[in-house]
Each structure stands twice: as structure tokens, then as C-alpha cells.
Regions:
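Transmembrane beta-barrel wall of Gram-negative outer-membrane proteins
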Residues: 252, 282-325, 329-374, 391-419, ...
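Periplasmic N-terminal accessory/gating domains of Gram-negative outer-membrane beta-barrel systems
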Residues: 66, 90-246, 265, 271-278, ...
Length: 1009
């Protein structure tokens, strides 16, 4: 079915959904309230009137109870409310200061007395700890937590670690080095879908979030790690819904400043690579300041809010002592080693919002947020020198206009128009050859520059909710039009030399760098010798995303709630379908098809966006005793992800008039260096340099072919949860939750033209490439490899979450989580993207099934705020995790596969290559080594000085990594045979700036009114 027919179907579906009076839904950026009205004998009261009033804006809504005494409000703004209930012949009851949180359904029951005497039910001003209708696995981060807990980078996503099962992961892309990267289900963070006021904030180029908001502008957010409702989609990982602050009838705001300096930091314990450490305290200075203000423009009608933050950071990263020593040996080759690499960063964030209340039934708001920053050397990880530096510029925007309409007391509509823009540039000031060595030591022009990503989206959403008796029907349509998405990515822009030995080992050889064969097999960073040339642009125009959902929240009995949902998601041109026919690899395979069944199977059809994205979801919650303090729940659902643009990117580049391609990628001993006639085994530094071909309109001999597999489909997870909630009292709750996630159709890149034994029983006869003869017969260039983007990856996650939460007990708020989990899969690395199997012929080999890179069996999280005497607050966050795995690898691939397979394939002890092909033995089990446990404690001590009833000055000191623990995590060297094998190479998550490497102190002040 072509895109026009799909668009027609989408429009027709929208009309059907919007015209139906029995199917309605709610947006994700709201809260709900429900309850039952009874008399003193517990008999239900029908037609009782319930009125809810927002205490900040004065906005009111009124409804009546049904014949079972039940009432419900949907599409409510999160905030503090008062609720009044009255019935014919009964008194009026009022609940004051009821807090409603995003994505939660609060329950407020009333028991009315006969007669006209009014009474007041006092309710604390915090959110109810138990959502009696909750069937998913979600956590709310409250306004108090955002304000009171320490934030190392003022990225509110750092608080998502308070959700059970969420762990920190390394940055998976150069554009995400300053983001809190969340590992959910053992994945690397790309599968997180973030919305702001219900509007898409997703990076469709590399996955994960795009924009960071001013922390002062965020009211609260909810993270759903598994089993979220049909309202949310486009994520096989977690869904995060963020809402911004609004103005109110009273002026309120803040002003703050935070200061850091090198003098407040402890020495970092830098890993030397041999099990010992050196100390270093690199230069550091940061100032972060800003504020917010909100209030009425016209009381009860028009409100405004504005927040601004500015960051000035003059920082640096300490070089690994091992890397510094090795790079100091090759200054004659152009290396510029330095004990520290400067990493300055400057940023502005702002948010503005206008809210207008037309009347009690209609309101609207406009929210606009922008972020702009520039930085230097943000890709440095402690193993690079100064020549491998870069600069980065970012400009981001997200906005929404939302209209809320109460059409009847039981029928609510919410319409949203959204906009998102992102422009990222990463480049360097020079171009020199890149030299790489084992363990990640490098110098020269960064292989990731230059690159540019641009994304422009327009979103149209309509969500409707209708309550009929015991049912609340929800439906909606979510349509995103992306007129432009793409940019350019010139990977491997200069000649790259990947040495199979460290500089110290090379210089110990009689001929030093003049020794032939030092590039054979390459290393874990590269293939040996390579370069790419051509037009690096990749552009997708008029991509679209359509989401439709229907859900029934059925209050089956007063004690049981059932959620029945169905969602449909469809992407249009997200896998580069419009470029496939022009892609030169596809065209070469078409030419070779008459001579090769393999080639014919690859072009028999073109890859298309998946069209069967139906995801059923069902959940139930049951109140065991009818008192709301013992709840059991369970559910099942399917969740489709997006295909982000980095997957088809290389294929799209090969559809340009002048294509961008790896001109050559030499790995094997017999590979000939172009233009020299010298095999790689005989080439050495000082030999004639290769001839670099000019950009071509066709693929060249030895280049890398890129293909989207004809059977490619969207990744999907099947998720199950079962849980129990025990409300110990009104201020304390315990929860236990088991979750199971099966991930299918994950991205895996397979070289279909890898070296294959002529006779597996006698590999001394040599190897051949399955497609080379067909290419020759077709008269087209013989490619070095054909790398097929498939959806053959699989992984599994099982976890048991135990959680204890306490609010206001002895002036303490506490969150304590423990997770016992196991994340396994087929060679699941930390990037969750373009995973190469170690043997392309056996992508699902038993020895390739093992722990995921982010597998952490035990994880403990504690967060608290204690209000001490004399206006002092103490707020710690503690995270501890067991050791994560890392992989044992060979110094060069022990299988004669050529390029296009996982680097450093290591045979099992005692196994030979011939034994492997005889299937007498196999490869070493994947990720079978473990690094070091993780421990981090951050804390804030604050002194509150009251300056009147509504004004407060808070003076504070924050400490990050309070115990000065060196967290190396699984950043260990797995290269067998090197002196550094089994020792840490650096800190966990080396390219991320969100985890403190040593004790870091910060002074600050915040004035609020």
C-alpha cells in the first residue's frame, strides 16, 4: 500500500474516531481523579454533585455521580486541588489540598452525612502514595523532588534514576554527552521516548531525547519503564512525560546561582591500565544561574510564566596516564599529548508559557522552550590527544499549543499542535590522518567529524475522554509531519591507520613503526587502513508518523479496574525507502542477481516501513480488601519502537549523485594497498601512501556496500508485569513488581559477503566471498563487504523491583528501591545499534548469547529529604550497583572473516580456527567478564531563611560523589595478551559528563517567592 493510500486511511480513521460517541481518550500530560460517594451506611449516592477547583488558577469543573455513586475527572492539569461533594438531602464534604500528579489517577471517596450540615475532610497537600487503578510500571517525580534533591547537571532526567530498574548508561552518541542516559531493560538508552506537555521530544536521528528544559520550568514528570497504556507509543523502552510550570493568581518565582571550582574538587583516581592509579585534579570552574517568574496578567483568566538558565563552564578532562605515556612516544608522528584536555561549555535554556481560561469548560495554553549551547572537545574520553578535538554547536526548540474543552460533564476533548526543531553541528578545525591503537588510544582527526543533524517536526494530536457508567473510554490520534530530517555525516574523513600493537610495543621492535604488518587485523577501533570519500549528506523529506489508540478503563467493580487498550503505529519513510532503488549497493545486487541466488533474494523486494504495528495492551488492578491498602496488579502489552535514521544513513548516502562510501577498508594480510601493489602484510609506515580515489557516482572496488534488509521490520517488545502494593499507612507504601521484557527484531548488521572457507574441513585451501564471483560476472565493482541492516537481534530482561516510599513521616520523604535483574541477549553492546555478530554466518550462535553490556544484577537506589531543626534540610541520593560485564577480545580477529564483523573475535581456550569451522569448539562466551561495582552518593545540605510568609532564601552546599569512590564500572580492557588485560582503562561511562569522577563540591543559593 503506497503512502497516499495510507494517508487516506489515516484521515478516515481519524474521522471515525472523532465522530464516535462511545470511544474517547486522554492526553499523556494530564492527571485524573475518581471516587465514590456513599452515605454513612455505605449505600452509594447517585446524582451527587462533585466540584473540583484548581487552587492556583481558580479553574473549576463539575460533574455528577452515576448510578453506582462513581465520579471521574479526566484531562486535569497536575497541581493542588480542593474537591467538594454534595447530594440531595446530604451535607457538603470537602477535601482540601489534594495533589494530582501527571499520568496518575487519584482516588478521593466521600461519605456524606444526612441533612444540611457541612463538614470538611482534611487531606494532606501531597500526592496520594497509592494509585488504586494503576496497572503499569511507572514512577512520578514530584515538584518537591525536583526542587530539593541534588542535580549534578540540572537535567531533570537525572531523577529518573529514582524509578526502580533504571540505571545510568554511557552516552551512545556525540550529541548526547551531557544528557542523563537511562538504561531500561538492559538497553543503551536509545529506546526512551520523551514528551513535553504531550509533544514529541524524540531524536529520530540517533534515538533518545533531544531537548533539556530549564529545571526551574519543570513542574513534574512521570517515567513509565514498562507496560504503559495505549495512550503512549513510539517506544519499546520507557516513556517519560514532562509538564512545564504555569502562572497562577499569585505571583511566584525564583532566582538561583550555583558555583563550582577546582578547589572544591578532590583528586581523581586515574586508572593506569595496570591495576594502579595516578591522581589528577583537572582545571574546573562552573557558574550556573537563572530564575523564573509567574503570575496573573488577568486574574482567573490569563496567566504567564517564564524561566531562564545560563551555564558557563571552563572545565577539562584528565588524560589516562597510560594513554598519555603511549601518546608521548609518537609526537614525531603528529600526536599532541596533554595531561588535560579542555572541555569548555556555554549554554542558555529558557521557557515561556501563557495560559488562558475562556470559561469553566474551555482553556488553552502555549508553551515555548529553547536551548542553545556550544562546546569544545566534548567527545574526548581520556584516551585522545589535542589533535582529536572537536567543537559542537546546538540549537533546539520545542513548543505546543493545547486547547482543553469540557463538552459535557462526561465528555472531554484535548487538541494539541506541537513543533520541534533541532540543529546540531560537530566539526574540527583541522584534518590530519587518524592513528588508533589497542585499548582505544588515538590521535588525529576524529572519525566522527564533521557531522550535522537537523530535525523539524509538526505534530497534531487530538485526545478525547468519555465516561459512560463504569467505563471511561479513551481514544486519540497523533500525527507527526517531519518535512526535513537529516544533514551530513562524514565518518572516517581522513586516512585511518589502525595498529594492532601499542606504541610502546611497536617501538620495542627492531624496526619500530617501519615493521611490516602492523595494520593486519587492525584493532578494536578499526579495520587496519581505511578512508571514506564522497557526498556525506542524508536527507529525508516529508517523513510521517501516525498513531491511533483506543482504551477502556473499566471499573468492573468497586475493587477491580481493568484496562483494555489497542494502539496502532505506522511510520512513513523512516527506513529510507525512497532511496533504496537509487542506492548503489541495491543496484549492484540487482546486476548480480542473475548470477547469485543470494543477491537475487536481497533485491526480490525492497524494505518498507512496517505496516502491522498493532499493539494490544491489557492490565488489571484489584483491591484485595476494599480499603485501598492492598492492591495487586498485572498486565501484558506489545510496544513498537521507531527506526532511527542512523540505521539507514549509510544506505541513504549511497543514493546521492556522488555517493559517500568507504573507498577502501583493508584488514587481511593479502589485502592490497590501493595504488601501491603492496599487500597489507608488507606495508609499513614510510611505504608509499595509498591512492585515494576521487568521489565517484558508483561504488569502487573494495568499498563497503550498505543495504536495508528486504525483510526489515520495526523493533517490538512483549512486556508482562505483576505487582503488589501495600499501603502501610497514609504516609508509607511498599511495592513489589516483577517485569519480563522480550525484545524482538532489534537492529543487527550482518556482512553477507564475509570471507567463507572454500572447504570448512580444510581451511588451508583458502577463503572466498559469496558475492564476489557474481559481481565479476555482472561486470560491476567487487565490493569489500555487503553490510545488511537486519532486524534479527533479540534480548530479554527479567527484573524484580522492591520499593519503599514514605512522605512526611517524621519530617522525612524517602524513596528506597532494590532491583534484582538479568539482561541477556545476542551480543548486546552498549550502543544498542549496528551490532555486528562475531561470525556473520552464525548471528545467533549459542556462545553469542549472554549478558548485555548494561546487565547489572543488583541495584540499590535511595533518595530522601529530611527537614531538620533550625531550617536545615538534608537531601541525599545514593546509587549502588553490582559489576557490569565486559568482553574478552583478541588483539586481532582470530577468524579470517575480513571486515564487517565484530572486532577481536576470540576463540575459546584450546580452540583453533580449524576446530571452529569443524564445529569441534567455538568462540569465547560473550561478555563473560565483570568489571567493578558502582557506588555514588550525592547530597545537598540547605539552610532555609524565611523572609516572610511566602519568601524563602535557601543557602546550600552540594556534594557529588561524596565518598570519592572511583567508579570504573565495566570500562576494563578485555584484550587478551595485553598488560592492561583485566584492569580498568578509565571511568564508567567515559564519554558522559553526568557522572562525577571524584568528589565535586558546589555552593549555591536560591530565592523563592
Amino acid at each position: 500500500m503506497n503512502s497516499k493510500r495510507w494517508l487516506c486511511l489515516a484521515v478516515m480513521s481519524c474521522l471515525v474516531l472523532l465522530s464516535s460517541a462511545s470511544m474517547f481518550g486522554q492526553a499523556t500530560a494530564n492527571a485524573s481523579l475518581q471516587g465514590t460517594i456513599t452515605d454513612r451506611s455505605q449505600a452509594v449516592i447517585g446524582k451527587a454533585e462533585v466540584t473540583i477547583t484548581n487552587k492556583e488558577t481558580g479553574a473549576t469543573k463539575t460533574t455528577t455521580t452515576n448510578d453506582t455513586g462513581g465520579y471521574r475527572f479526566d484531562s486535569l492539569s497536575a497541581g493542588i486541588y480542593s474537591i467538594k461533594a454534595t447530594g440531595p438531602g446530604f451535607s457538603t464534604a470537602e477535601a482540601k489540598d489534594v495533589e494530582l500528579l501527571i499520568g496518575r489517577t487519584a482516588t478521593q471517596n466521600f461519605s456524606l452525612s444526612p441533612g444540611g450540615v457541612s463538614e470538611t475532610v482534611e487531606v494532606t497537600g501531597t500526592a496520594p502514595l497509592v494509585d488504586q487503578t494503576k496497572t503499569d510500571v511507572s514512577t512520578n517525580i514530584t515538584p518537591e523532588q525536583i526542587t530539593e534533591l541534588p542535580l549534578i547537571g540540572r537535567d531533570i532526567a537525572d531523577l529518573a534514576y529514582l524509578a526502580p530498574g533504571v540505571k545510568a548508561a554511557d552516552s551512545y552518541d556525540p550529541t548526547k554527552t551531557r544528557y542523563a542516559i537511562l538504561s531500561v531493560n538492559g538497553e543503551g538508552g536509545r529506546n526512551i521516548n520523551v514528551t513535553v506537555n504531550g509533544v514529541d521530544n524524540k531524536d529520530n536521528t540517533v534515538g533518545g531525547p533531544v531537548m533539556q528544559l530549564p529545571a526551574e520550568a519543570v513542574q513534574e514528570f512521570q517515567i513509565s519503564t514498562q507496560r504503559f497504556s495505549a495512550v503512549n507509543g513510539r517506544s519499546a523502552g520507557a516513556a517519560i512525560n514532562v509538564i512545564t510550570k504555569s502562572g497562577s493568581n499569585n505571583f511566584h518565582g525564583s532566582a538561583f546561582a550555583f558555583f563550582r571550582d577546582q578547589a572544591f574538587n578532590a583528586d581523581q583516581k586515574l586508572a593506569n591500565g595496570d591495576g594502579t592509579t595516578s591522581t589528577g585534579n583537572p582545571p574546573y570552574s562552573r557558574q550556573w544561574f537563572g530564575g523564573s517568574i509567574g503570575g496573573p496578567i488577568k486574574k482567573d483568566k490569563l496567566f504567564a510564566f517564564f524561566a531562564f538558565e545560563r551555564q558557563r563552564e571552563h572545565t577539562s578532562i584528565a588524560e589516562s596516564p597510560t594513554a598519555l605515556a603511549e601518546l608521548s612516544l609518537v609526537t614525531s608522528l603528529g600526536a599532541q599529548p596533554s595531561s588535560t584536555v579542555p572541555t569548555p561549555f556555554f549554554e542558555n535554556r529558557l521557557n515561556g508559557r501563557l495560559d488562558y481560561i475562556f470559561n469553566s469548560n474551555n482553556s488553552a495554553y502555549l508553551s515555548v522552550s529553547t536551548q542553545a549551547n556550544n562546546s569544545t572537545n566534548d567527545q574526548s574520553n581520556g584516551l585522545f590527544d589535542l589533535t582529536e578535538g572537536n567543537f559542537t554547536k546546538n540549537h533546539l526548540q520545542v513548543a505546543n499549543l493545547t486547547v482543553n474543552s469540557t463538552l459535557t460533564p462526561t465528555l472531554i476533548n484535548q487538541f494539541t499542535v506541537g513543533f520541534q526543531y533541532w540543529n546540531n553541528l560537530i566539526d574540527s578545525t583541522g584534518r590530519t590522518p587518524l592513528f588508533t591503537f589497542p585499548t582505544g588510544i588515538e590521535f588525529g582527526t576524529n572519525t566522527n567529524v564533521p557531522q550535522n543533524s537537523i530535525q523539524r517536526k509538526y505534530q497534531f494530536k487530538d485526545d478525547i475522554a468519555k465516561t459512560i457508567g463504569k467505563h471511561t473510554f479513551k481514544t486519540g490520534v497523533d500525527y507527526i509531519w517531519t518535512p526535513f530530517m537529516g544533514g551530513f555525516f562524514e565518518f572516517n574523513p581522513t586516512l585511518e591507520f589502525d595498529f594492532n600493537k601499542l606504541p610502546s610495543a611497536i617501538l620495542a621492535l627492531p624496526q619500530g613503526f617501519n615493521t611490516p604488518g602492523l595494520l593486519v587485523g587492525g584493532n578494536v577501533n578499526g579495520s587496519g587502513m581505511s578512508i571514506a570519500v564522497g557526498d556525506p549528506t542524508f536527507i529525508i523529506r516529508d517523513a510521517k508518523q501516525l498513531g491511533l489508540y483506543f482504551q477502556d478503563d473499566w471499573k468492573m467493580t468497586s475493587r477491580m479496574t481493568v484496562n483494555l487498550g489497542l494502539r496502532y503505529d505506522k511510520d512513513f519513510d523512516f527506513i529510507g525507502g525512497s532511496d533504496i532503488a537509487q542506492s548503489r549497493t541495491f543496484q549492484e545486487l540487482q546486476a548480480a542477481a542473475p548470477f547469485s541466488p543470494l543477491a537475487a533474494s536481497l533485491v526480490a523486494k525492497k524494505a518498507t516501513d512496517y505496516s502491522k504495528g498493532f499493539s494490544p495492551r491489557v492490565g488489571l488492578a484489584y483491591d484485595l480488601n476494599g480499603h485501598g491498602n492492598h492492591i495487586v496488579r498485572a498486565g501484558f502489552g506489545m510496544y513498537f519502537d521507531n527506526t532511527f535514521q542512523n540505521i539507514p544513513l549509510f544506505m541513504e548516502q549511497q543514493a546521492n549523485p556522488t555517493i559517500f562510501q568507504t573507498a577502501f577498508s583493508l584488514n587481511g594480510a593479502s589485502d592490497v594497498v590501493p595504488g601501491t601493489g603492496i599487500p597489507l602484510s608488507a606495508w609499513h609506515l614510510g611505504s608509499p601512501l595509498p591512492t585515494i580515489p576521487a568521489p565517484q557516482a558508483a561504488l569502487t572496488t573494495g568499498s563497503i556496500g550498505r543495504l536495508m534488509d528486504p525483510n526489515y521490520r520495526t523493533p517490538v517488545t512483549e512486556e508482562f508485569n505483576g505487582g503488589y502494593t501495600w499501603a502501610i499507612n497514609s504516609k508509607s507504601v511498599f511495592e513489589a513488581e516483577y517485569v519480563h521484557v522480550l525484545s524482538l527484531h532489534e537492529n543487527k548488521t550482518i556482512n553477507l559477503d564475509a570471507n567463507t572457507p572454500i572447504d570448512p574441513s580444510n581451511i588451508s585451501l583458502g577463503f572466498f566471498k559469496p558475492l564476489s564471483a557474481a559481481f565479476t560476472s555482472a561486470g560491476v565493482p567487487v565490493l569489500g563487504s555487503v553490510r545488511d541492516e537486519t532486524s534479527g537481534g533479540r534480548s530479554r530482561y527479567d527484573g524484580m523491583n522492591l520499593s519503599f516510599r514514605q512522605r512526611g513521616f517524621h519530617k522525612m520523604d524517602l524513596t528506597l528501591n532494590y532491583t534484582l535483574a538479568r539482561a541477556v541477549g545476542y551480543d548486546v553492546d552498549g550502543t544498542s545499534f549496528r551490532n555486528y555478530p562475531r561470525d556473520p554466518a552464525r548471528p545467533l550462535a549459542p556462545e553469542d548469547f549472554g549478558p548485555a553490556f548494561n546487565d547489572e544484577r543488583h541495584h540499590l537506589t535511595l533518595a530522601a529529604t529530611t527537614h531538620l531543626p533550625w531550617g536545615i534540610d538534608f537531601s541525599p541520593i545514593l546509587q549502588a550497583g553490582s559489576a557490569r560485564p565486559y568482553n574478552a577480545i583478541a588483539q586481532s580477529n582470530q577468524l579470517s572473516l575480513g571486515g564487517g564483523s565484530a572486532a577481536g573475535a576470540l576463540l575459546a581456550p584450546g580452540c583453533t580456527e580449524q576446530g571452529y569451522y569443524n564445529r569441534a569448539c567455538g568462540l569465547n562466551p560473550i561478555f563473560n567478564l565483570r568489571g567493578a561495582p558502582y557506588f555514588d552518593m550525592d547530597a545537598r545540605v540547605a539552610k532555609n531563611i524565611k523572609l516572610g510568609e511566602h519568601r524563602n532564601l535557601q543557602l546550600m552546599f552540594q556534594a557529588f560523589n561524596l565518598t570519592n569512590h572511583a567508579n570504573y564500572g565495566n570500562n576494563f580492557d578485555g584484550t587478551v595478551g595485553l598488560p592492561s588485560f583485566g584492569h580498568p582503562l578509565g571511568f564508567i561511562n567515559p564519554t558522559s559528563s553526568t557522572l562525577p569522577r571524584a568528589f565535586t563540591g558546589e555552593f549555591g543559593a536560591r530565592f523563592s517567592f
